[in-house]
């Protein structure tokens, strides 16, 4: 825990998960059923990560009000900590040093030995900032650069903050999970979902299904929760995604709606 004036930065625990999750949800949509489900899934994710790692997020409080967050996960085989996001959602809390306080607190914490690294401190913090800031909001990529993060060679979107002198970050190449086609998935839409660090993930899945239903009235949709039907999710090989006629949809709706729907139609053979 660290404090600066009327601001205090606190590690997330089971006692303040609610504060962390609510910072992710727009105030005007707190009663939205999609976000309610998304928050439920985020709470499950945080609880699981706390049991596994002990520390995965911090919340900044300004005058006792949750004002900002930073989320991160250890990556033991790379000896680094990956920052998933840093977020100060409300304009009245901007330009008050909240983001800086959150990141500074994390940097201080990660200079100490960690059990998950055999008693050694991490070698670096790494992050891949994503766009989406509101008008007038400090872009995350600019913030991290101003805080001393440097671009990783060969990857303009990846930034690194070394904690050990001379450390050069070289990401481990990984293959993402691959969908295992199922006979039961033919002729329908199947949505796999489960615990997620971001409540928007479920909202985006809902929005994608809505677009599909509007484009293809009467299409059959099956939702599979990895929490409620773990065996069904596991045999398909992916933790989250949209499957159409036993084909995984790779296009993200918000990136390109037209391309998303085209991929759906092709999967259904309705080109």
Question: At which residue positions do the language-model features occur?
Answer:
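Short amphipathic alpha-helix that is part of the acyltransferase structural core
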Residues: 1-48, 59, 199-200, 204-208
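A conserved beta-turn-beta hairpin within the catalytic core of GNAT-like acetyltransferases
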Residues: 75-84, 94, 117-118, 184
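A short, internal acetyl-CoA/4′-phosphopantetheine-binding micro-motif in the GNAT/acyltransferase core
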Residues: 85-98, 129-131
């Amino acid at each position: 825990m660290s404090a600066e004036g009327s601001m205090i930065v606190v590690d997330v625990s089971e006692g303040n998960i609610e504060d962390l999750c609510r910072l992710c949800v727009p105030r005007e949509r707190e009663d939205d059923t999609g976000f309610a489900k998304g928050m439920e899934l985020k709470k499950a994710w945080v609880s699981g990560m706390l049991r596994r790692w002990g520390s995965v997020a911090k919340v900044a409080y300004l005058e006792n009000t949750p004002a900002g967050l930073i989320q991160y996960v250890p990556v033991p085989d790379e000896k680094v900590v990956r920052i998933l996001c840093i977020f100060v959602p409300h304009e009245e809390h901007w330009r008050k040093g909240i983001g800086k306080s959150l990141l500074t607190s994390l940097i201080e914490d990660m200079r100490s030995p960690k059990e998950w690294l055999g008693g050694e401190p991490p070698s670096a913090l790494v992050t891949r900032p994503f766009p989406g800031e509101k008008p007038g909001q400090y872009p995350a990529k600019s913030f991290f650069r101003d805080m001393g993060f440097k671009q990783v060679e060969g990857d303009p979107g990846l930034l690194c903050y070394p904690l050990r002198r001379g450390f050069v970050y070289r990401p481990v190449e990984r293959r993402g999970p691959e969908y295992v086609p199922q006979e039961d998935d033919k002729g329908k839409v199947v949505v796999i979902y489960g615990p997620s660090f971001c409540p928007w993930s479920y909202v985006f899945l809902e929005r994608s299904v809505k677009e599909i239903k509007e484009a293809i009235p009467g299409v059959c949709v099956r939702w599979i929760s990895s929490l409620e039907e773990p065996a069904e999710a596991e045999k398909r090989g992916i933790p989250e995604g949209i499957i159409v006629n036993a084909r995984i949809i790779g296009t993200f709706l918000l990136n390109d709606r037209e391309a998303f729907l085209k991929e759906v139609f092709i999967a259904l053979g309705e080109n």
